[in-house]
From Swiss-Prot:
CDD domains: HicDH_like (cd05291)
Enzyme Commission number(s) of this protein: 1.1.1.27
Pfam families referenced in this protein's UniProt entry, alphabetically: Ldh_1_C, Ldh_1_N
Alphabetical list of InterPro entries matching this protein: L-lactate/malate_DH, L-lactate_DH, L-lactate_DH_AS, Lactate/malate_DH_C, Lactate/malate_DH_N, Lactate_DH/Glyco_Ohase_4_C, NAD(P)-bd_dom_sf
Alphabetically ordered keywords of this record: Cytoplasm, NAD, Oxidoreductase, Phosphoprotein
Gene Ontology terms, MF aspect: L-lactate dehydrogenase activity
GO BP terms: glycolytic process; lactate metabolic process
Key word Endoplasmic reticulum present: no
Record-given protein name: L-lactate dehydrogenase 1
Amino acid sequence: MARVEKPRKVILVGDGAVGSTFAFSMVQQGIAEELGIIDIAKEHVEGDAIDLADATPWTFPKNIYAADYADCKDADLVVITAGAPQKPGETRLDLVNKNLKILSSIVEPVVESGFEGIFLVVANPVDILTHATWKISGFPKDRVIGSGTSLDTGRLQKVIGKMEHVDPRSVNAYMLGEHGDTEFPVWSYNNVGGVKVSDWVKAHGMDESKLEEIHKEVADMAYDIINKKGATFYGIGTASAMIAKAILNDEHRVLPLSVAMDGQYGLHDLHIGTPAVVGRNGLEQIIEMPLTADEQAKMEASAKQLKEVMDKAFEETGVKVRQ
């Protein structure tokens, strides 16, 4: 008799703009067979579950429902998008105290349910909240992952692709560091077809100010979107579904994620964006990119900023931790 595999189950916590976009992307791509959604607005979740299920005749079969924390017990993946949204004029780090308290109220009941899967944190500031999820949950580092600089890297690929007239998927590029103002592109590596972007810029009569222009455009893109429409959700919702797919399908894929530093880049005791390999068991490998002295200094400055804000927030909120 053929062995019947257990359906892959995902619990989404947070049914706002990002969460619902993530859920829709999961439905469209047929990622996981079961999707439970948790939010304090229970009636809204029930409506979303019905609405999402209406798409399944043209996509993929999926059991979608309004869930409770008890449903996390046998889930493979818990995705956290819940939190106060970033408002015009706010940085992601401005959200930390509000969202740290919200996060604590989520992680505790998930752990108490008997959950033994993987946490994927998407809520902002994602690096700090991912580290907090690890500390609050007591989980191993390989089972707590943040979306990190996945969206920022995608934005960088988009901008470079437009400049060089190539498909963004053909752009080999990374943004590292905080998912926020101190993030930076790795120009010593970033390339298209093996030709460094920095060399392409020079060959086309531009100077290094073009690289700074690209950096600023990518770093400021979220602020531009928020000022124009109030929130960002299509990009991050789709990127988060891509990460979930890589984990659930055991793809062993390299993605720029927020992962725990254990000496990489000389950093310890924080989560920050760097390429990492993920699969069915979560984090499999952290890839430490070789950086120039200038890039290393930017990584250290980004980490320092995160650490200062994080330590202050933990002290002010008094969030209880297991490790």
